[in-house]
Amino acid sequence: MLYLASRSPRRQELLQRLDVPFQTVQLDVPELRAADESPDHYVQRVALDKAHAGLALVQAADPDAIVLGSDTEVVLGERVFGKPVDVDDAIAMLRALSGRTHQVLTAVVLVCAQRAPAQALVVSEVTFDRLDDAQIAAYAACGEPMGKAGAYAIQGRAERFIRHLSGSYSGVMGLPLYHTSQLLTAFGAH
């Protein structure tokens, strides 16, 4: 059985599009970046930590379990934008992203007890239009930025702010479907 180690409703929705039966494992994994840790290493480590934590929860009941872990972070330069802690934090993130191109890093990892992990790192580039303070305040007030890396949901109201996207739309949402499908096939789970 395939298990998704994520609380994200977006990842659940995206994984359903691949027509693979799965169950969701609810867990909390610390997402703390070390001072000297690169953004790409960080996002891959967190995805692997989630997958291993999920496997630890289900392996006794399902020795053949395959667990998918994923993490998405928004990166501008060397600054990693996680999920905003409050509306003011969301506003600060959106101001920083306004009129600029940033990267969205999404790591996907598959683990099981019988083989080495398989993983992919998908890097997309997103360019925001210039946003004025009124646009930023209105978007932050709608609540959508909360719980989203970089304080925006590309599939929601923020889509109108995106001038250009290069890479994986589903990866920016939280689970790059092409790469996930390829990993599942290689792992024998698709």
Curated annotation (Swiss-Prot):
Q: Name one GO biological process term.
A: nucleotide metabolic process
Which InterPro entries does the UniProt entry name for this protein?
ITPase-like_fam, Maf-like
Entry EC no(s):
3.6.1.9
Show which residues form the site (Important for substrate specificity): 10, 72, 155
Which CDD domains does the UniProt record give?
Maf
Please write the reaction equations for the catalytic activity of this protein.
dTTP + H2O = dTMP + diphosphate + H(+); UTP + H2O = UMP + diphosphate + H(+)
Cofactor(s) recorded for this entry are:
a divalent metal cation
One Gene Ontology cellular component annotation held by this UniProt entry: cytoplasm
Q: Which UniProt keywords apply?
A: Cytoplasm, Hydrolase, Nucleotide metabolism
One Pfam family here? Maf
Tell me the active site.
Answer: 71
Q: What biological function has been recorded for the protein in this entry? A: Nucleoside triphosphate pyrophosphatase that hydrolyzes dTTP and UTP. May have a dual role in cell division arrest and in preventing the incorporation of modified nucleotides into cellular nucleic acids.
Q: What is this protein called?
A: dTTP/UTP pyrophosphatase
Name the source organism: Xanthomonas oryzae pv. oryzae (strain KACC10331 / KXO85)
